[in-house]
């Protein structure tokens, strides 16, 4: 899925912004979070996040759930490079493995595991 953020801002501008963020906030990770293509979950009101490196994926999912006011009975999945990251993984680890060339970590969320069961077993 093509990121709307990438479409809106040229690479040079995104790279300069992520470098400025990382330099200013050493222990924070610049994350872009956008709704996945065919999801019935509402759009998020804010897509740019500065996430503490020691936050787990599960804690980040909780933050996203709160931002979109998702009821507890509704499932949500987040994807990084079309894979479902382990819930206990630290965001700093996911960032090191999957950050984009522009310096941002791109995360999408969906109400379905749209990439099949194989995505549940992504390697760290």
UniProtKB/Swiss-Prot annotation:
Signal sequence, renumbered to the chain: none
Site (Cleavage): 116-117
PTM: The C-terminal 8 residues are removed to expose Gly-116 at the C-terminus. The C-terminal Gly is then amidated with phosphatidylethanolamine by an activating system similar to that for ubiquitin.
Stated role: Ubiquitin-like modifier involved in autophagosome formation. With ATG4, mediates the delivery of the autophagosomes to the vacuole via the microtubule cytoskeleton. Required for selective autophagic degradation of the nucleus (nucleophagy) as well as for mitophagy which contributes to regulate mitochondrial quantity and quality by eliminating the mitochondria to a basal level to fulfill cellular energy requirements and preventing excess ROS production. Participates also in membrane fusion events that take place in the early secretory pathway.
Single Gene Ontology BP annotation: autophagy
Taxonomic lineage from the root: Eukaryota, Fungi, Dikarya, Ascomycota, Saccharomycotina
Propiece residue ranges: 117-124
Source species, domain of life: Eukaryota
Localization per record: Cytoplasmic vesicle, Autophagosome membrane; Vacuole membrane
Entry protein name: Autophagy-related protein 8
Record-level GO cellular component terms: autophagosome membrane; cytoplasmic vesicle
Keyword terms, alphabetized: Autophagy, Cytoplasmic vesicle, Lipoprotein, Membrane, Protein transport, Transport, Ubl conjugation pathway, Vacuole
Gene3D superfamilies according to UniProt: Phosphatidylinositol 3-kinase Catalytic Subunit, Chain A, domain 1 (3.10.20.90)
Gene name tied to this protein: ATG8
Lipid-attached positions, Phosphatidylethanolamine amidated glycine: 116
Membrane topology: Lipid-anchor
């Amino acid at each position: 899925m093509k990121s709307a953020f990438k479409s809106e801002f040229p690479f040079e501008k995104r790279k300069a912004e992520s470098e400025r963020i990382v330099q200013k906030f050493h222990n924070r990770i610049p994350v872009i979070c956008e709704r996945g293509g065919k999801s019935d979950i509402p759009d998020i009101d804010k897509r740019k996040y500065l996430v503490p490196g020691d936050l787990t994926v599960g804690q980040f999912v909780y933050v996203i759930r709160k931002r979109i006011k998702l009821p507890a009975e509704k499932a949500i999945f987040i994807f990084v490079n079309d894979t479902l990251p382990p819930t206990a993984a630290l965001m700093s680890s996911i960032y090191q493995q999957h950050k984009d060339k522009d310096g941002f970590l791109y995360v999408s969320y969906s109400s379905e595991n749209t990439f099949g069961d194989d995505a549940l077993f992504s390697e760290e």
